[in-house]
């Protein structure tokens, strides 16, 4: 929605303005997604965030992750979950993906978000691999790409050597390669 786009742009602009502040972080700024963070054990989450026990609070999905990143120094912005993802593990291609983004960021203009096109880079070169993936997913969603297509774009299945793949599906996987590889 337009409101979601405005919230996304406002958050990105604010983060750019305050980029030198190492403790400033906005866990979520959305009318649809709330990201709670806390250095707590799962049994205490209801005490730490009492609004989660309110019967008026309704959700179709909840993700809980209970540890800090293992390959970077602990920081609130790197604590799981992120704005859209919770990911445990290593993304082996992260440096290549970051370099790909930097080389193609001018191609990634989203017509519905002209203000955002001035805010590149949107992907961190130094934060965790999962955080970077979450940033890119958030960018694609803000540009009106659906969640399933965005995830397939960012993490396509191994399809190049599959001779049994029908041509329509192959074309579907080939299209985002111009954006993601």
Regions found by a protein language model. Give the residues of each.
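Conserved catalytic alpha/beta cores of large enzymes that bind or transform nucleotide phosphates
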Residues: 92, 99, 106-162
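Conserved small/polar residues in nucleotide/adenosyl-binding loops
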Residues: 180-181
């Amino acid at each position: 929605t337009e409101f979601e786009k405005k919230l996304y742009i406002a958050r990105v602009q604010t983060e750019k303005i305050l980029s030198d502040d190492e403790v400033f972080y906005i866990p979520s700024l959305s009318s649809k997604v709330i990201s709670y963070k806390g250095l707590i054990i799962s049994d205490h989450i209801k005490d730490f965030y009492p609004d989660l026990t309110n019967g008026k609070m309704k959700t179709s999905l909840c993700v809980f992750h209970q540890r800090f990143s293992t390959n970077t120094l602990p920081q609130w912005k790197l604590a799981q979950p992120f704005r859209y993802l919770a990911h445990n593990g290593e993304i082996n291609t992260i440096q290549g993906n970051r370099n790909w983004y930097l080389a193609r960021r001018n191609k990634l203009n989203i017509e519905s978000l002209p203000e955002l096109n001035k805010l590149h880079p949107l992907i961190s070169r130094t934060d965790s691999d999962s955080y970077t993936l979450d940033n890119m997913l958030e960018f694609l969603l803000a540009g009106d790409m659906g969640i399933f297509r965005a995830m397939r774009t960012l993490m396509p299945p191994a399809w190049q050597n599959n001779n049994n793949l029908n041509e329509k599906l192959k074309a579907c996987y080939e299209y985002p390669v111009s954006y993601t590889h």
